[in-house]
UniProtKB/Swiss-Prot annotation:
Descriptive protein name: Lysine-specific demethylase 3A-A
Gene3D superfamilies: Cupin
Sequence ranges of Basic and acidic residues compositional bias: 266-280
Ranges for domain JmjC: 1086-1291
Zn finger limits (C6-type): 683-708
Highest classification ranks of the organism: Eukaryota, Metazoa, Chordata, Craniata, Vertebrata
Molecular-function GO terms, alphabetical: chromatin DNA binding; histone H3K9 demethylase activity; histone H3K9me/H3K9me2 demethylase activity; transcription coregulator activity; zinc ion binding
Primary gene name: kdm3a-a
Keywords from the named record: Chromatin regulator, Cytoplasm, Dioxygenase, Iron, Metal-binding, Nucleus, Oxidoreductase, Transcription, Transcription regulation, Zinc, Zinc-finger
A Pfam short name: JmjC
Entry keyword annotation includes Membrane: no
The record's free-text note on cofactor binding: Binds 1 Fe(2+) ion per subunit.
Length: 1331
């Protein structure tokens, strides 16, 4: 059996240790046991990183009173040796009853700091003893043979009790360190740093899963709100008093657990009236399983039988569970000062969980619910950051040649136990260690080991037990699809099973959304990802595979499954301790659920190739199919709008994939890399997210995208291999990766991508959605979908698959495959969406990328307004809706258009709103170019004429829409007509709805003032380290309190990357809710907004982090500061809205108002903007300059020219815009307008204004006063094109650039947005006849 802890629990707090302290120690090398060892327990730590050279630990020694506790520097000069408890082993010990040496369980200690050599000796402590011994490593053996060990524990109560204490301690520590939701409401004891007390009591009010901190309520220390179990010792407290009532009916068990401490610690706690219930080891303990609160794994607990059982749990009714779920938890957060060094390095940066859910009982594990794939535990080398290991000794042999294999993990705490011929054979007849006669209840009292023989038992998250029988589980099928399958596409096959016709044809089919927190949390990497146990851990299936030699899919890491075979890159790095910290090494294995294995005739595990595209199962294919049952928060109208805007983009994506597939060598078998939950496939060369087709090395799993593969082949053919833009990593033993040795691999199973492409065309035709894609042009030679290459030799069916694979879909509705050219024919007329086609057939490199970007971002004209007379079902696409300004006089245009007879004849009640939208959109851009030079007069447009009751006005020479009511339900209709033109938009008045107390500087200073933070000097861009958040907030509105430079001048600072962490919601829950409840245009801006395409990405994938993010900075007021920017010119890959939540006017500076007015005027703001400041007394916060995305290349060339004039270099892997190294002052903006004709929008953002910035639009910010801004990113259907282009641009940035890595996954977003849209449209096809 194997008990391992999968988390990288490199945590010292709560662990027992033994050490040598002193400076001048005279030690006898042969008398290790006589050295002055001191043992104790670690109570607190200053840092989480054990390798930090400055880490200090707060310890209590066993032979001293707790009042003498002290801090010691772990790597200081006085610490000569430091050993911590490591894992469970067996060692010889003489039985007191008959003086016969027997092997007994013991805890071995691992050397963490070793300045002296122990030689061949190792430190261990027998379970139940306090003394530590030093024995030869040869006498220590790993634990084997579960059954005999179980019997040994039953007959020896001392070991039984100690082992249960050890297990319970590990369970409690795991729950606390993982911050599981089902500990909310539980009482705890927290170690006190106050000299007057050792412990104090508290209650867990909330958990923060990201930083794994606990929010607590404490009567003794009311100011203490947040603690981190990794830095301060925390133990769970359990109450078993209610179990005395034997008349209570059996109820579903509620998981509880209790911390274990040594007996002397318990006594100390009892002296402070903190008594712990007594424990009777003779009491029978039975085990049940239930699903964790997050539903991710199963947990072993005890079924309550009596009051004195160690693992009894309080029974709760359903009503009790509902009450727990409905508790309202406080979101206030603060870091206490009283903890001193104990909390050094601890930042409260995680979210609170609103609801505490009680886990339901489960009698068997889920089919996909094991915590990690099983395999062999690897021993950590010195380079690894892991403190605790789960295996006593690493063996470089095939782990699964025996019927019962072991499991482990490189990050295991561990109790590594492996099955083999019995090591406990002599224990069955051995007398009881305690010398007592066998109790009558002895044989029945299986205690902890009852779980080992239960096939449905799995230990808490982080623990696994390898047993002789396992439940049935899902396996990847590798059998060939039947050749006689009916001619149906994979989409049609699933539709017959899932999609049903709506009962009401007039109502769109909408899937019921599961109950979730009101604001979905941005998922962390591999958060809660679980997979079934390895097939090799089932003895029966293992034996069958060995006998038959059938192929099966690798379902664990290379190190665990087959250490003697080729290891992938991740597993090789993982083996040598150089891999990044990750929760589950198997999930990140390149060959996980990808490579096939089989046993040869000698029983050795061998490679059997890789999965092919036709080897999918229902779960794999459903992720990629348009199934209405999987779609939430999407209505019929929104689906049509999304498809009208991004349908052509999707078609070009499919065309590009077809062309690449058709250009591959027909002799090469295409592999299928199954999408792995919680893992983002990325190119190893350019860090771009891989959508589908890519090339993989079969030896190490190295993978490159289509573009990098094409560039490499071109550089090799031209003899310029040393000059390629992206270097390739080397393979095993340092060999170079040659393109011809890589295998083509796809991620989308089967022909699902091409099937969805066919459905897009048919659905758009049925619903009258206009399309401009190449594949809809009759003059273009049709490009049929490529046939997925079958294996040369069919594979042997997999033994006993739990879910039969779907029949190989026959989706060829077109003629037989024909030869497809490597580049598509040029259409008769250029399409506005030719950008993606050009991209797919053009090799982008350093020399031609600038010209490529410029040539494909040209402004395309539109048909005349006569097209508005067409049926409204022919929806406008993004490309076809871009309108160019006309030179005709627009006087009376709106009235004439409304009174036209054609419009009256063809307009009905349904189509009027859409027609008015188009009229409004055309009106925005239908002005003479000469009007740009006029001073702003405002455009008095009556809302009634627009068809919407939407208060608004115009700024920036009538080029900038400003919506005045953030709560107006019609805002998004008006907004999108300007938004689709690529124009920024302002929404004002948001501050009136916000809770102003939450956004004041005082509240931030009070809650987070002690946190360390990096500050940036806005004048010099220098980073100031060692400061605190409080230092920044103290000078926010007081110039005299600001930090000074070397000359004694107050610096203009901004907080860099604060608050830290991936999710704003984790750190500031109450502010997050306040913002999300009041953010304008929630259809676009909320995480689940129906027009936010990022919401369409399934939770199966790693969703992009789109904010919110805070931007806090002082104002630049002086005339000299006008050449500096708070945020220099840059652009973002996604759309964004930036809300001004607070404006602070600092005291201590004269003539601020006059300087602000001059700065606004110097920034080219219009008269209406100045009027808002002077007459309406609004608070101006920041001056923005935003430029159109189509002008990006002109600005780039202009800045390069200016850089050359100033003698600066322009490295090829850097970009003047992406580097954020320029601020365009008045002089540069005038040159840009005169030399390139580029004019942007000068916007002054007042308090409560939300500025919407389109994706790809260059912009810069200059704070006028001290500002607190919060930005939220989103992906709108109108700007997907720019998102994609920016992703391509970012590929060429240096690897140190913050924007280099592709986190948005535009192709995945496009695919799943289209997939969901057509699912809704197909489900509503029955309603077409009713329209």
């Amino acid at each position: 059996m194997v008990l391992t802890q999968q988390e990288n629990l490199s945590v010292l707090v709560g662990q027992r240790f033994t050490c040598l302290l002193g400076t001048d120690l005279q030690l006898d090398p042969d008398g290790v046991s006589k050295w002055p060892w001191k043992s104790g327990i670690v109570r607190a730590a200053s840092h989480k990183d054990l390798h930090c050279p400055e880490i200090k630990i707060f310890v209590e020694f066993d032979d001293e009173a707790w009042e003498k506790r002290t801090w010691i520097e772990l790597y200081g000069a006085t610490v000569k040796m430091f050993l911590v408890e490591h894992n469970l082993v067996l060692a010889d010990r003489v039985s007191p009853s008959n003086s016969v040496p027997v092997q007994c369980p013991a805890m071995v200690y691992k050397v963490l700091v070793g300045k002296f050599s122990l030689g061949t000796a190792t430190c261990l402590q027998f379970l139940g003893d306090k003394d530590k011994l030093f024995l030869s490593k040869e006498l220590v053996k790993p634990v084997r043979d579960r059954e005999t060990l179980k019997q040994f524990m039953q007959e020896n109560k001392t070991f039984n009790k100690a082992f249960q204490e050890l297990i319970r301690k590990s369970v409690d520590e795991s729950r606390l360190q993982q911050a599981t939701r089902n500990i909310i409401g539980m009482p705890i004891n927290v170690y006190s740093m106050d000299p007057s007390m050792q412990w104090f009591s508290a209650t867990i009010s909330n958990v923060r899963t990201a930083s794994r901190a606990l929010e607590i309520k404490c009567e003794q220390l009311p100011s203490l709100k947040i603690i981190d179990p990794a830095l301060l010792h925390v133990v769970l407290v359990h109450n078993y008093g209610d179990l005395n009532d034997k008349s209570r009916k059996p109820r579903a068990p509620k998981r509880k657990s209790q911390d274990t401490e040594s007996e002397d610690q318990t006594e100390l706690k009892q002296t402070r009236n903190e008594e712990v219930p007594s424990k009777d080891v003779t009491q029978k303990t039975s085990f049940l399983t239930y699903r964790r609160d997050d539903g991710k794994t199963l947990v072993v607990v005890d079924n309550p039988k009596a009051t004195n059982n160690l693992f009894n749990y309080i029974n709760t009714t359903t009503e009790d569970q509902q009450k727990v779920q409905q508790q309202s938890l406080s979101s206030k957060q603060s870091v206490p000062v009283g903890f001193g060094e104990a909390l050094l390095g601890c930042a409260a940066t995680t979210p609170g969980i609103l609801n505490a859910a009680t886990p339901p009982q489960a009698n068997s594990p889920p089919s996909f619910g094991a915590a990690t794939p099983q395999g062999k535990g690897t021993q950590n080398l010195p380079g690894d950051t892991t403190l605790l290991n789960g295996e006593a000794k690493r063996e470089e042999t095939n782990l699964f040649l025996s019927a019962a294999a072991s499991q482990g993990n490189k990050r295991s705490l561990g109790f590594g136990m492996m099955e083999s011929p019995s090591t406990f054979s002599s224990l069955s007849s051995m007398p009881s260690w305690s010398g007592q006669p066998k109790s009558e209840n002895g044989p029945k009292s299986e205690n902890l080991f009852a779980a080992f023989t239960n096939s449905s038992t799995v230990f808490p998250k982080g623990f696994e037990f390898s047993v002789k029988s396992f439940p049935e589980q899902k396996m990847l099928s590798v059998t060939d699809s039947p050749k006689t399958a009916p001619p149906m596409t994979c989409v049609q096959q699933q539709e017959q099973k899932v999609v049903k016709k709506p009962e009401n044809n007039h109502t769109s089919v909408r899937a019921i959304k599961p109950q979730e927190p009101p604001y979905p949390k941005s998922p962390n990497k591999n958060d809660g990802v679980t997979y079934p146990r390895s097939i090799l851990l089932d003895p029966q299936k293992l034996k069958r595979l060995q006998q038959s030699g059938d192929c099966f899919v690798q379902d664990g890491s290379c190190n665990d499954i087959a250490p003697h075979l080729h290891k992938c890159r991740e597993c090789r790095l993982d083996r040598f301790g150089r891999s990044r910290e990750q929760r589950d090494s198997a999930v990140f294995c390149r060959f996980f659920h990808f490579r096939r294995l089989h046993f040869n005739k000698h029983g050795m595990l061998k490679e059997g190739g890789f999965l092919t595209p036709n080897k999918y199962d229902a779960e794999a294919i459903n992720l990629w199919l348009p199934l209405a049952s999987n779609v939430v928060d999407l209505d019929l109208d929104t689906a049509k709008y999304i498809l009208a805007n991004i349908g052509d983009h999707f078609c070009k994506l499919v065309m590009s994939e077809k062309e690449v597939m058709s250009a591959t060598d027909p002799s090469k078998q295409v592999a299928w890399k199954r999408a792995v939950r919680g893992v983002r496939e990325m190119c190893d060369a350019c860090d771009t997210t891989i959508f589908n087709l890519h090339w993989v090395c079969p030896k190490c799993g190295f993978g490159v995208c289509v573009d990098c593969y094409r560039m490499k082949k071109k550089s090799l053919s031209s003899g310029e291999d040393g000059n390629e833009t992206f270097s390739w990593l080397k393979c095993v033993k340092g060999q170079l990766h040659e393109p011809e040795n890589l295998m083509p691999t796809q991620i989308v199973p089967g022909k699902a991508l091409y099937d969805v492409g066919d459905i897009v065309h048919s659905v758009r035709g049925r619903w009258g959605i206009k399309s401009n894609c190449l594949c809809s042009n009759k003059h273009v030679r049709p490009v049929v979908k490529p046939v997925v290459k079958e294996e040369v030799k069919p594979s042997t069916p997999e033994p006993e698959p739990t879910k039969a694979p779907l029949a190989q879909p026959n989706v060829c509705t077109a003629p037989d495959p024909i030869a497809i050219p490597s580049t598509p024919p040029t259409p008769a007329c250029s399409s506005p969406l030719s950008w993606l086609t050009n991209l797919s057939q053009t090799t982008v490199n350093k020399e031609n990328k600038d010209n490529l970007f410029a040539s494909n971002l040209e402004h395309k004209p539109l048909p005349s307004f006569a097209s508005f007379g067409k049926p409204v079902s022919a929806l406008q696409t993004f490309g076809s809706s871009i309108l160019t300004p006309t030179t005709s006089n627009n006087s009376g245009f709106l009235r004439n258009l409304l009174n036209s007879s054609t419009l009256k004849q063809e307009t009905n009640e349904k189509s009027t709103p859409k027609i008015l939208d188009d009229i409004f959109a055309s009106l925005v851009q239908s002005r003479p170019l000469s009007d740009f030079a006029r001073k702003p007069q405002g455009l008095p447009i009556q809302p009634s004429l627009m068809g919407f009751n939407t208060p608004h006005y115009w700024l920036c020479d009538n080029r900038l829409l400003c919506l005045q009511d953030p709560n107006n339900k019609s805002n998004w209709n008006v907004f999108r007509e300007c938004w689709k033109q690529g124009q920024p938009v302002i929404v004002s008045g948001i501050h009136n709805n916000l809770n102003s107390e939450l956004w004041r500087p005082e509240s931030f200073r009070r809650e987070f003032g002690d946190q360390e933070a990096d500050l940036v000097n806005c004048r010099t861009n220098d980073i100031i380290t060692g400061a605190t958040v409080g230092d920044f907030w103290e000078g926010f509105e007081d110039i005299s309190a600001r930090l000074k430079n070397d000359k004694g001048e107050a610096m203009v600072l901004k907080l860099k990357d604060w608050p830290p962490g991936e999710d704003f919601r984790d750190t500031m829950l109450s502010r997050f809710e306040d913002l999300m409840n009041n953010i304008p245009l929630p259809e676009y801006t909320r995480r689940e907004g129906k027009l936010n395409l990022a919401a369409r990405l399934p939770a199966y994938f790693v969703r992009p982090d789109l904010g919110p993010k805070m931007y806090n900075a002082y104002g630049l007021i002086t005339p000299e500061d006008r050449k500096y920017g708070t945020t220099n010119l840059h652009l973002d890959v996604s759309d964004a809205t930036n809300v001004m939540v607070y404006v602070g006017i600092p005291k201590g500076e004269h003539d601020q108002e006059q300087e602000v007015i001059r700065t606004i005027q110097d920034g080219d703001a219009d008269e209406l903007t100045i009027k808002r400041y002077i007459e309406f007394k609004e608070k101006p916060g920041a001056l923005w300059h935003i430029f159109a995305a189509k002008d990006t290349e002109k600005i780039r060339q202009f800045l390069k020219k200016v850089a050359e004039e100033q003698g600066h270099e322009n490295p090829p892997d850097h970009d003047p815009i992406h580097d954020q190294s320029w601020y365009l002052d008045n002089t540069l903006r005038k040159r840009l307008l005169q030399e390139h004709g580029v004019q942007g929008w000068a916007i002054v953002q007042f308090l409560g204004d939300a500025v919407f910035i389109p994706a790809g639009a260059p912009h810069q910010v200059h704070n006028l006063y001290s500002c607190i801004k919060v930005a939220e990113d989103f992906v709108s259907p109108e700007h997907v094109k720019h998102c994609f282009w920016l992703t391509q641009e970012f590929r060429y940035l240096s690897h140190t650039h913050t924007n280099h890595e592709d986190k948005l996954q535009v192709k995945n977003v496009i695919y799943h947005a289209v997939k969901d849209s057509i699912a809704i449209l197909k489900a509503n096809e029955a309603s077409l006849g009713k329209l």
